[in-house]
Amino acid sequence: MNAQALVLTDNAANKVRQLRDSEGNDDLMLRVYVTGGGCSGFSYGFNFAESINEDDAEFVNGDVKMLVDSLSYQYLVGSVVDYVEGLEGSRFIVQNPNATTTCGCGSSFSI
């Protein structure tokens, strides 16, 4: 898997670093995944992991790691993971060039 296929922005890396530091656990990594659901067919999910699975692709921004499993990877190739703060609240978002449609809030998509 090409390590340049996904990008973790500086904003997202800074937020992960902040959350990781608040937990006092430098081993935490951001896991990004795709699951069925949402109004457009697929949804993005985010959680923290302490270990890398055998089928994970690993992407790095400074001292922050982002993990994507092999199934989700095929839907996320070329995507940019960012962190935004706005009227809708603060959240991680995925700018996915593979998505043909997205819902209004951007949390689900179809291909």
Swiss-Prot record:
NCBIfam families: iron-sulfur cluster assembly accessory protein, PRK13623.1. One of its GO terms (molecular function) is 4 iron, 4 sulfur cluster binding. Binds 1 iron-sulfur cluster per subunit. SUPFAM superfamilies: HesB-like domain. The keyword tRNA processing does not apply. InterPro entries: FeS_biogenesis, FeS_cluster_insertion, FeS_cluster_insertion_CS, FeS_cluster_insertion_RrpA, HesB-like_dom_sf. Belongs to the HesB/IscA family. This is Iron-sulfur cluster insertion protein ErpA. PROSITE patterns: HESB. Its cofactor is iron-sulfur cluster. It holds the Pfam family Fe-S_biosyn. The lineage of its organism: Bacteria, Pseudomonadati, Pseudomonadota, Gammaproteobacteria, Moraxellales. One of its GO terms (biological process) is iron-sulfur cluster assembly. Required for insertion of 4Fe-4S clusters for at least IspG. PANTHER family: IRON-SULFUR CLUSTER ASSEMBLY 2 HOMOLOG, MITOCHONDRIAL (PTHR43011:SF1). The keyword Iron applies. Homodimer. It comes from the Bacteria. It comes from Acinetobacter baumannii (strain SDF). Iron-sulfur cluster binds at C39, C103, C105. Gene3D superfamilies: HesB-like domain. Keywords: Iron, Iron-sulfur, Metal-binding.
